[in-house]
Amino acid sequence: MFLCFCAATVLCFWINSGGADVVPNGTLIFSEPVPYPFSLDVLRSFSQHVVLRNKRAVTTISWSYSYQITTSSLSVNSWYVTFTAPLGWNYYTGQSFGTVLNQNAMMRASQSTFTYDVISYVGQRPNLDCQVNSLVNGGLDGWYSTVRVDNCFNAPCHVGGRPGCSIGLPYMSNGVCTRVLSTTQSPGLQYEIYSGQQFAVYQITPYTQYTITMPSGILGYCQQTPLYVDCGTWTPFRVHSYGCDKVTQNCKYTLTSNWVVAFQNKATAVILPSELIVPVAQKVTRRLGVNTPDYFWLVKQAYHYLSQANLSPNYALFSALCNSLYQQSATLSTLCFGSPFFVAQECYNNALYLPDAVFTTLFSTLFSWDYQINYPLNQVLTQNETFLQLPATNYQGQTLSQGRMLNLFKDAIVFLDFFDTKFYRTNDAPSSDIFVVVARQAQLIRYGNFRIEQINGYFQVKCSSNIISTLEPHPAGVIMIARHHSMWSVAARNSTSFYCVTHSLTTFGKLDISTSWFFHTLALPSGPVSQVSMPLLSTAAVGVYMHPMIEHWIPLLTLAQSQYQPSFFNIGINKTITLTTQLQAYAQVYTAWFLSVIYVRLPEARRLTLGVQLVPFIQALLSIKQADLDATDVDSVARYNVLSLMWGRKYAVVNYNQLPEWTYPLFKGEIGESMWFRKKIMPTTEGCQTSAHFSSITGYLQFSDYVYIPKYNKVSCPISTLAPSVLQVYEVQSLFVILIQCVSGSYDWYPGLSGGTAFVYKSYKLGTVCVLLPSDVLSTGPNIGFYSGTALSIVTVQTTNDVLPNCIGLVQDNIFTPCHPSGCPVRNSYDNYIVCFDSSTYTFKNYHRTTPPVMNVPIQEVPLQMEIPTVILQSYELKHTESVLLQDIEGGIIVDHNTGSIWYPDGQAYDVSFYVSVIIRYAPPKLELPSTLANFTSCLDYICFGNYQCRTEAQTFCTSMDYFEQVFNKSLISLKTALQDLHYVLKLVLPETTLELTELTRRRRRAVYEFDDTISLLSESFERFMSPASQAYMANMLWWDDAFDGFSLPQRTGSILSRSPSLSSVSSWNSYTSRTPLISNVKTPKTTFNVKLSMPKLPKASTLSKIGSVLSSGLSIASLGLSIFSIVEDRRVTELTQQQIMALEDQITILTDYTEKNFKEIQSSLNTLGQQVQDFSQQVTMSLQQLSNGLEQITQQLDKSIYYVTATQQYATYMSSLINHLTELAAAVYKTQDMYVTCIHSLQSGVLSPNCITPSQIFQLYQVARNLSGQCQPIFSEREVSRFYSLPLVTDAMVHNDTYWFSWSIPITCSNIQGSVYKVQPGYIVNPTHPTSLQYDLPSHVVTSNAGALRFDDHYCDRYNQVYLCTKSAFDLQPSNYLTMLYSNISENVSLTFHPEPRPDPCVYLSSSALYCYYSDQCNQCVVAVGNCSNQTVTYRNYTYPIMDPQCRGFDQITISSPIDIGVDFTALPSRPPLPLHLSYVNVTFNVTIPHGLNWTDLVLDYSFKDKIYEISKNITDLHQQILQVSSWASGWFQRIRDFLYNLLPTWITWLTLGFSLFSIVISGINIILFFEMNGKVKKS
């Protein structure tokens, strides 16, 4: 591989791997590009900044920045960018050579080392006119047109150092010159190495290791000796030769380097090739599942190298690098800024990434440098403090987000070009764009037309050549500079702020990026978008951000809006990119934010003029969907919320990972940390009469509008022995709220403040003191102090208002929370500590909200039309005369659904009937997926949309869907088929017996008949049972145990998630899909076999009979209950007949009495049966072994034809399938019986279990009512009791992800109730007289939103989605019979009425701890998510299930969606609401299944072996008892079936895998052998 580079006939580089090749001068020729990206060394060489001077005269050169070997075309992975050439050359005679590197150079680099020759011809030895500054860190003195670096007076190479020549000063008479030039000189200079009468011109390039070998025969001092460049104290120097030391002949050098320079004759235009979109093979970053080329790894690599440096990197190097990046970004932005907001996709994908990536890397590296902030020691800078100082770790992690950190420094880069500048970061600034620059030695600081010059020891501040202010320096020699969106603040001994416009808008569609670039740098979001750079802001928003004259933007916005519809900012994004809408939303929010920030900085008069014009554009920017905004990006969400409120949109996205910055207090932290206070309330020593707990503060730095207090350790508690642990300062509406916590007993504090009034209240909770400091009365600067004495008491005030106007915040749990401007909410509790103001007086009181009680009133029926639900939570418009009933009887009786507590207000006496609602919130344990199910990826992808963090949390849901759709559904189908076939077999086999029946046998025969009828009923019930709601209910039962238990589950095609079956989870039952003979055309000889096995000892009949009686009664009730369910669901009847109700009550009474009286006997019987089953399983194992031996004998005598082999294999496959079914069904049985066993133990112990409500708990709940002062008796009708003994049927509306809700309501009648007996905090508050009246307190544990039932007159009311539905009958599901209950407070006669057509119109606002819904004519949408909840859903059968994050599992997420027309399109209700009475008592009674397409008749009568008779010997009498026994096992009523199945299954699998073809059970005793011919006739032996 070789490269040849030529520039006209001037200079040629021959580059190859081993020798020199002569190529004619001409166009650049190369065999292949160097296949390596930039190396670290090349980047280092790029980063030097050269100032060209002609002798001492400053010349203006048409170049903006340079690399050491400056290129006109930079290539990174085939990406070419053209730059302007900086270097001019002269011949040694002084004749101008021209620009060597003008538009014809490019550079490539390699990670490997190249050795190549450099040939220079006669007369081609240019010199460089350069400037060398005299700096404190070393360098040459004065100005030199030609810098000559000789080799120590031409002394020979000495032994004391490395052999060869060294470059540098000072001269040395002995040894090797070791001192090198510091890079504080502008590096990249041409030096002539003196050799005799000739000069060899070398280019000194830092950070490049070169070895120059001068061949023998060439004159020069270092002939035949390598020329080394020593490493200095901390910087390696590299030297590169551009010429020879001989003028009279051509010369050749051999160079070794890891980078090459190429020349070409003609510069080509910058073209972004299509290859740019293709990922780079060497460096690829995977962002959000998409491979993206990482063009900036070289920058990251360089800065990583910088951060590892042992000593401080040189400041000039950093400055030059910043300039280089700055110019690159300007060039690239110009290239891609042809149309407004850049619709060029290639530009977007490639070039525009560079600026943000560079600056992101730059700032992140700054924070990794190991520097510390040191304020000037003794207020004096030390002499060597001339380099950048930045903090290391104090701004990582929780202290500051990356967004705040980068915003802080987005303007700092302006000042990095001044060598003698120290950079400081304040610790807890109230605004994130405050920074401090200490400029002591710099004579001039300039940015655009903003200048600060040192003149006669003073700082003169200029804007556009106009002197604005002259400042006296701080005693420390320090000035501090900050910019607040073009509002400059300069602080010295005296401070000033002024408005200085530093940027201008040039032409439409092209911004003056070159003057505004350094202001654009934006934080990357902290959420999932963090891997996506934000070039949208780099060009489009930067102009909005920077230009202070907002009126200049009106024509631009108008034109942009007219050209780019429908979206205001249609940013030409490739719609296939992941999270593109989120990216666009991000840019729109930030653009609106910048416009708003500029807007609020304008004078009031200009605001009024421009506000009307600006509003539609801001609202257009905010027209994005809330779902498109990444809720985990705290900065974006906070800005969006503020903008929404600021510009009249009353809704907001309120999903936070943490509190947004705008809710933070001015200070919140430990004592001793830094604090910020407004300057006007800064404490002084004036008027201080006595020592205060807040001692005066001195030595602070005044800065802009703030006073910074570096440390404040002098806060103390009234009791001197105590130290305050928390000091919090909040600023709200001209008031400072200070909370001080001292853990001690109660005490009083007295405010001692001079020059104004403050309000200090004694501890509202133990150890917490609240101090109110009105900032408007403290402008004189009083001293803040607290003195022992009498403080104001906290008054308790009763109010009927839900929201208190003229209140600014509330204190709860030692935290102050600002309220919405409309006022603060009041809850039904005594812990509402609210700060309010009246005129100039501030108050701190404990408010308690009271509302009139609600009596029982008659209810009229109003028909409503209902449809399938489309929302989770329903809201209504709140008029002055009505509001939604959101608590059981708001203001009357309050029921805490978590504790059962009951509360009556106002001490009045009532006669009331109500329900105590019992809620069971059942969330199964997290499921571990077996390895065979690990690739269920489609479900996770469907739910998580590529969010990898979501995948872990979504496994529970996916697993539940699999259970729901696969295992249980198929198990029920298989079981139903088996029951039907077993019923047929019993009918078929019984008449064939020829035994003489004894009385015992006849009794057993009758038992079989009864069992047969029961199975028939049960199989019919299963058909009705296969509804979605029933499936969900049974899935819940099966869920109780560890999911799957290691068994591989089948896939079902056509499911809602459209999965493809994985190979490891395809069940064998899919193999039998059609009814075909198992084996056909098999010809074998007729043979009769008689295999005898010993009969295992069966469990005692007495044990089975006791269980059997429970079984039979349970089955009859189940069939009745399911029949009722079927009738109701079909809606063919509206009322149950009296006979049905009586039969139902009779059966319930039977079950109730039996369960209550006999559960101990059942438990004892189960234990006895379990031991018998264990013994039986061991005997069965022996019997199966005997069967195996008998089958071997049969096998040896059978014909070995190919037909028989085929039959054997097919039958073995079938038996394997049968065992698989049995295994999976057994797993379902385990999970079911575990649930029942748990309930039995719960009945026995009286302890509430997570899945079982027991009679004893019911009476415990009744005790709550008995403890009241009045007389309360529970309504204990048989109908009501039945609600507690039937497992509740979980409908679709009650299943949320992995959480099930079971609810019962206990009816209680109370009379003469007195006073407030139990106090609870209701979840919802309604005030019908206030327009902003709906508050949702954030739930702390189980939410009460979907619980409870009310009974008014003869109506039974259950709450669905915050609406009470009431019907005359608990079984009446006709939509026309439902009423929607709303609370009305029309007159003094408080009444409950029903309104058929409420109209919703909600809006939402979120405070940091409370959620409000506001209702007004302007609001039309309300979407609220409380907690860290993702708003993702999955729809199944017209029902929408939320997929929730683990932090809000359950009902911690509240979602309000509207507008919704309530009336003919009423959408708040499920089409099938859960029944008030849920009878779904089901027993799995048999666990045998056969392949699809076959029944028992096929197996017993016609086995499809045409020429073979099979013998199946059975003892009919024992078979009856065995069938009863098997049915009892599978019913789930005994505890040790697991041991039996686990002992039995391995034996079955063992002999099945041997390939035996027959399955025959022969039991000792009376053997009756049945012969079945192929014509089906039966012979008897």
UniProtKB/Swiss-Prot annotation:
Q: Name one GO cellular component term.
A: membrane
Offer one example of a GO biological process linked to this entry: virion attachment to host cell
Q: Does Transcription count among this protein's keywords?
A: no
Recorded protein name is Spike glycoprotein
Intravirion domain ranges by topology = 1573-1581
Virion surface compartment segments: 21-1551
The SS bond pairs are none
Q: What is its main location?
A: virion
The residues forming the signal peptide are 1-20
What role is this protein assigned? Mediates the binding of virions to the host cell receptor and is involved in membrane fusion.
| Transmembrane helix listed as a keyword | yes
Question: Where does the protein end up?
Answer: Virion membrane
Topology term for the membrane: Single-pass type I membrane protein
- Oligomer status and interactors: Homotrimer.
Q: Which family does it belong to?
A: Belongs to the toroviruses spike protein family.
Entry's transmembrane regions: 1552-1572
Residues bearing glycans: 25, 384, 494, 574, 935, 969, 1267, 1297, 1385, 1389, 1428, 1431, 1438, 1483, 1487, 1495, 1515
Keywords, alphabetical: Fusion of virus membrane with host membrane, Glycoprotein, Host-virus interaction, Membrane, Signal, Transmembrane, Transmembrane helix, Viral attachment to host cell, Viral envelope protein, Viral penetration into host cytoplasm, Virion, Virus entry into host cell
